[in-house]
């Protein structure tokens, strides 16, 4: 089955808006064993839209088109699909009634331009939209079918889940089995090299392997087609987990902050944070997780040396002897946070995020991290590359990963 994506809108081509819909759908289709063959971006121009619809539907069995479904002058999708088919637009009364009721709830009358959202090419199947005002629609075009959806992400994704993905699954019949593991701080090339014995195994003929690097994560993914796919995918999973061991921090939809919160909650324990160069990023990552209040005791941004001494009890002589960016100070920050918060765990981070402040002995990107727990304190040193934001974010995620490992 050949699938293409056609994303429309001037805003996507001027850089005002980043298309997040297409990567999301590509990932969901990959779970079904399908790789999108092409993605096309096209402006709100009638000639360009008609040409793009003709081109994509001549190649693909399914074209998922987004944008241009609203009430304004530059919303042209229904009009252009109808022009390609050589059919008129027709008013869809059930959609008109839904729009009237929606506007009534907001105390407004339905205006003529909003009625535009309920006009579709003759013969189209209308896809109701529970998340917004503009329905989607689908109609046969060319060698296959085009599905036209609003571009608002929550609406696009909802309609994909309700119509596009079930339609694709029904066309495919037996859905392939897929697996995904997430590695922490493993370069993509290293992951590929380590996976060679699995990929070259004749038992895995026909399996599609893929990698995605999004520092500090690298994702290893596999899709297994055909009979016995689930059992084959499970065997691959066991081999992958054996290869990477503790470098695997999660699978599927797992996210590192959520895993850390879940592990702390399962143990009935809390953590306290003593951050310097990260400026509260670790606390931000944790508090973004629902339920974090049950496991996060306190977060201190002790940026100045005086604050390190006064708030977290870092000894002045330690700072004088080793400097703020050092392993002893990272340990003292972790232990001070743990002590101050009365928590089971403490995390300490200190470093030079740049762009200035580095020395030959401690260049920009030098970061010391520590985790203090019931059995003592573990510390690591890292030399990160990148700009100030990248260094700080790497350090924040590294701190969470160290805590994850300590909680195993």
Curated annotation (Swiss-Prot):
Alphabetical list of SUPFAM superfamilies matching this protein: CinA-like, Molybdenum cofactor biosynthesis proteins
Pfam families: CinA, MoCF_biosynth
HAMAP family in alphabetical order: CinA_B (MF_00226_B)
PANTHER family: NICOTINAMIDE-NUCLEOTIDE AMIDOHYDROLASE PNCC (PTHR13939), NMN AMIDOHYDROLASE-LIKE PROTEIN YFAY (PTHR13939:SF0)
Family to which the UniProt record says this protein belongs: Belongs to the CinA family.
Protein name: CinA-like protein
Organism field: Anaeromyxobacter sp. (strain K)
């Amino acid at each position: 089955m050949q699938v293409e994506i056609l994303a429309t809108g001037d805003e996507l081509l001027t850089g005002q808006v980043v298309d997040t819909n297409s990567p999301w759908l590509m990932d969901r289709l990959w779970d079904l064993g399908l790789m999108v063959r092409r993605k096309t971006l096209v402006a709100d121009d009638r000639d360009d839209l008609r040409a793009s619809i003709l081109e994509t539907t001549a190649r693909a069995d399914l074209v998922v088109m987004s944008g241009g479904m609203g009430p304004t002058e530059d919303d042209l999708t229904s009009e252009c699909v109808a022009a390609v088919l050589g059919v008129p637009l027709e008013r869809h009364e059930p959609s008109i009634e839904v729009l009237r009721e929606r506007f009534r709830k907001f105390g407004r009358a339905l205006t003529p331009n909003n009625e535009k959202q309920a006009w579709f090419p003759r013969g189209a199947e209308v896809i109701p939209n529970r998340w917004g005002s503009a329905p989607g629609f689908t109609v046969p075009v060319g060698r296959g079918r085009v599905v036209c959806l609003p571009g608002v992400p929550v609406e696009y994704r909802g309609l994909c889940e309700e119509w596009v993905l079930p339609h694709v699954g029904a066309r495919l019949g037996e859905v392939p089995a897929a697996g995904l593991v997430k590695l922490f701080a493993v370069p993509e090339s290293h992951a590929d090299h380590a996976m060679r014995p699995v990929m070259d195994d004749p038992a895995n003929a026909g399996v599609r392997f893929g990698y995605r690097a999004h520092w500090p994560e690298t994702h290893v993914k596999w899709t297994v087609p055909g009979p016995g796919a689930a059992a084959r995918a499970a065997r691959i999973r066991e081999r992958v987990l054996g290869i990477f061991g503790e470098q695997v921090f999660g699978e599927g939809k797992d996210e590192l902050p959520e895993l850390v919160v879940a592990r702390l909650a399962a143990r009935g324990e809390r953590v306290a944070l003593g951050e310097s160069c990260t400026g509260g990023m670790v606390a931000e990552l944790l508090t973004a997780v629902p339920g974090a209040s049950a496991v996060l005791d306190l977060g201190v941004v002790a940026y100045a040396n005086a604050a390190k001494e006064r708030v977290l009890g870092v000894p002045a002589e330690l700072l004088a002897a080793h400097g703020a960016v050092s392993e002893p100070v990272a340990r003292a920050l972790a232990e001070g946070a743990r002590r101050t918060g009365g928590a089971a765990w403490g995390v300490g981070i200190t470093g030079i995020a740049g762009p200035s402040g580095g020395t030959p002995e401690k260049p920009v990107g030098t970061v010391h991290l520590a985790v203090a727990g019931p059995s003592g304190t573990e510390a690591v040193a890292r030399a990160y590359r990148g700009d100030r934001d990248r260094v700080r974010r790497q350090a924040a995620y590294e701190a969470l990963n160290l805590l994850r490992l300590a909680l195993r």
